[in-house]
Design a protein with these regions (language model features):
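N-terminal Rossmann-fold NAD(P) dinucleotide-binding loop
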Residues: 153-154
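Adenosine-nucleotide cofactor-binding segment
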Residues: 145, 161-216
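NAD(P)H dinucleotide-binding glycine-rich loop of Rossmann-like/cofactor-binding domains
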Residues: 45, 78, 84-149
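Short glycine-centered segments of the SAM/dcSAM-binding site in methyltransferase folds
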Residues: 84, 142, 166, 228-229, ...
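Glycine-rich beta-strand-centered segment in the early N-terminal region that forms part
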Residues: 21-39, 50-92
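Glycine-rich phosphate-binding loop and adjacent beta-alpha segment
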Residues: 216-286, 318-323
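C-terminal capping/lid region of NAD(P)-dependent oxidoreductase domains
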Residues: 1, 285-292, 300-323
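Short, glycine/polar-rich helix-capping loops at beta-to-alpha or helix-loop-helix junctions
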Residues: 93-96, 171-179, 240-245
Length: 323
């Protein structure tokens, strides 16, 4: 199978494109011929060796994609050859063919094209669980979204605003702050003295802070009102600092960890979350990102672009020959 792979950790230069042995089709799995696969920051962290990878080199990155089923393993009843499917938690996705456990596939609506689905599934369902499960947002809540112009942050802002929450957004540049405002943020801030600005704007702080940076955990807690909570779901800036539990007790503040795989644990859950995500897109509650495509063989170029913090939008890799 043609794939984008690496056999050592490092920068984009370690990525190679070529043929690797086909993966065996296990019982309970299907073989998907991909038409579009998403590129996410987690793929960069895996390439760098920051995130743990199973098995031995060579490793194929990617977790999210869209395609059609070309083979069905024994014990699979729900899916058939030729069916169009998506997935958001299937490893080794950056390849022309992917072996996927049958319970990790989702059926896709006809009105959402392959590239949009591949661009939206993982980040969209992530934002969805952060709003519904970890944050448990309600209309009238005041929330702060860090990195609000990023892939998840953009959707978080849109979903929270559609729910009726008052969204305060952090973004690093004037253009990104303008993007956050256009996505529904009521107030936007840069990263200079943002805690004081948020507290002045809200009176005594926000109800929920979505922290994807990690190193900002102490500041996130300081931006909360008494009884508020930080949902920490990333460490883009580095490892979060230690916190004293007694400091949380004094104002009844809390820190909630956010990890998608806690909630994405059943086939029915995957499908219902995907259905609700695409319904939100159809209703205009959220919008698809600006999509930049590269051939799978140019994956190293795509990785370099994604690592550029000035990049906005979503990168989708297209198997060679399908552009």
């Amino acid at each position: 199978v043609k794939a984008l792979f690496f056999d050592r950790f490092g920068g984009p230069e370690v990525l190679r494109y070529g043929a690797l042995p086909d993966q065996a089709l296990d019982a309970g799995s299907v073989l998907v011929e991909t038409s579009a696969v998403g590129l996410n920051f987690a793929d960069i962290y895996r390439r760098q060796g920051v995130y743990l990878l199973e098995g031995k080199a060579p490793w194929i990155g990617g977790y999210e994609g869209v395609g059609r089923i070309v083979a069905v393993g024994t014990g699979v009843d729900r899916w058939r050859i030729g069916q169009r499917v998506g997935f958001l938690d299937v490893p080794r996705a950056h390849a022309a063919r992917v072996c996927a456990p049958a319970d990790r596939l989702v059926a896709l609506p006809d009105d959402v094209d392959d590239r949009t689905a591949a661009a939206l599934l993982l980040q969209g369902v992530t934002a969805q669980y952060l709003v519904e499960d970890s944050g448990r947002l309600a209309a009238g809540d005041q929330v702060l979204v860090q990195a609000a112009s990023g892939g998840v942050g953009r959707l978080l802002t849109q979903m929270a605003a559609a729910l009726g929450a008052e969204v305060h957004a952090l973004a690093s540049t004037p253009s990104k702050r303008e993007q956050a405002r256009s996505n529904g943020a009521s107030a936007v801030y840069g990263y200079d003295d943002w805690v004081a600005q948020v507290r002045r704007a809200t009176g005594d702080g926000v109800d929920v802070v979505y922290d994807s940076i990690g190193t900002t955990l102490h500041d996130s807690l300081a931006a909360l009102r008494p009884g508020g909570r930080v949902v920490i779901f990333g460490k883009a800036g580095g490892t979060p600092p230690a916190i004293d539990p007694l400091s949380l007790m004094e104002q009844s503040k809390g820190v909630v960890g956010g990890d998608l795989w806690t909630y994405l644990n059943r086939a029915e859950s995957r499908q219902s979350r995907a259905d609700r995500l695409f319904a939100a897109l159809r209703a205009g509650m959220i919008t698809a990102p600006v999509i930049t495509t590269f051939p799978l063989s140019e994956g190293a170029v795509a990785h370099r672009l994604l690592e550029d913090r000035n990049f906005a939008g979503k990168i989708v890799l297209i198997p060679d020959g399908l552009r």
